[in-house]
A protein has these predicted regions:
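Conserved loop-alpha-helix segment in the C-terminal half of the alpha/beta-hydrolase fold
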Residues: 258-292
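Alpha/beta-hydrolase fold catalytic core
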Residues: 1-61, 86, 125-126, 313-331
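Conserved hydrolase catalytic core segment
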Residues: 126-169
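Conserved HGGG/HGGXW glycine-rich cap/lid loop of the alpha/beta-hydrolase fold
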Residues: 50, 55-99
């Protein structure tokens, strides 16, 4: 039985060591501007006492960009500036992510949809095309399902609403290990505290297909953000409530807005999971981009734009409003 005591001692030592590592991490300082988009000033909007970072630039019909789990608005750096040449583009850091506040919250699907809805109201955004990637795409679909006045149409890029929320574990061995341990009591939080830049980089690489897809410095930025007090707790809470994204799919049948489902052929979702969304969302169009993975706006930005802009133009021919006409003309 001595080996049992030895194992327990090692585990306890590992837990204690993780707390020391976390305490010694240097707390990062928020950037005052985006190196990749200096023309877009960094601003904040407050929702229920929680400050959310966002940027806005461009003139024209409104687009809102929503990122995914454990990332931030910088995920759109390859499409946001291009879109801003034709549209008014907003990109938002979700609560507990990026440089937004990290509140004590449930971090489930309802929470994110509620916060984003209120943020759009505070920003007086109406009739916008909501473009979300992964969980951001799921948020966009749920906003439309709940008939939010802010939603004109939705582009859901690789929406994350399958496999009980465990889809990321399909991306790589490292992601399977790290996120597989997250829900294990004590061990999961210990792994979170021992996070490192190489592991963050490997997990991000599991979401792209092309070798040059990840911009220089992005992994480091996302890793540094993870050193903010409370960040690991927030991500742990989100992972514990992953299943709520798939459960919320029951609301898709209520969507009455135009929807474009855009997938990479190497997304973590399976063919039948994509087909289920196309079936369950009335009138949804499904497109698949070749040789591209989950973080599609980074992996295949030109192809995303090539699918997106013509689709916006089709909104008017399908009986859309004057807003759709403006979208088509601006494209």
């Amino acid at each position: 039985m001595l080996w049992i005591g030895a194992v327990v001692a090692v585990l306890v030592a590992g837990v204690l060591f993780s707390y020391v590592v976390e305490a010694l991490r240097r707390k990062p300082t928020a950037p005052t501007r985006l190196a990749w988009w200096p023309a877009a000033p960094i601003e904040t909007v407050e929702v229920d006492g929680v400050r959310l970072r966002y940027v806005a630039a461009g003139e024209g019909p409104t687009l809102v960009l929503l990122h995914t789990l454990r990332t931030q608005l910088d995920m759109f750096q390859r499409i946001a500036p291009v879109l801003a040449a034709r549209f008014r583009v907003f990109a938002l850091d979700l609560p507990g992510h990026g440089w937004s506040d990290i509140p004590e919250a449930r971090y489930d699907a309802d929470y994110f949809v509620d916060v984003v809805s209120k943020a759009l109201e505070r920003l007086r955004i109406r009739d916008a095309v909501i473009i979300g990637e992964s969980i951001g795409g799921s948020i966009a679909l749920l906003l439309a399902a709940r008939h939010q006045r802010s939603v004109r149409a939705v582009v859901a890029i690789n929406p994350y609403d399958y496999a009980g929320g465990q889809g990321i574990r399909r991306s790589s061995l490292w992601a399977n290990l790290v996120f597989g341990l997250t829900n294990v009591p004590v061990l999961g939080s210990t792994v979170n505290r021992l996070r490192s830049l190489p592991v963050v980089t490997l997990i991000l690489r599991g979401g792209v297909r092309r070798r040059d897809a990840l911009p220089a410095g992005l992994a480091r930025e996302i890793h540094l953000v993870g050193n903010r007090p409370g960040h690991a707790r927030a991500i742990g809470a989100l992972v514990r409530h992953w299943s709520t994204w798939e459960s919320a799919r029951t609301e898709y049948a209520a969507i009455e807005r135009p929807v474009l489902l855009l997938y990479g052929d190497h997304d973590w979702s399976l063919d039948h999971e994509r087909a289920a969304n196309a079936h369950d969302i009335p009138g949804a169009e499904l497109r698949v981009i070749s040789n591209a993975g989950h973080f599609l706006s980074l992996d295949a930005p030109d192809e995303v734009l090539a699918e997106l802009v013509p689709w916006l133009g089709k909104l008017d021919s399908a009986g859309g409003s004057n807003q759709a006409t403006a979208l088509a003309h601006s494209a």
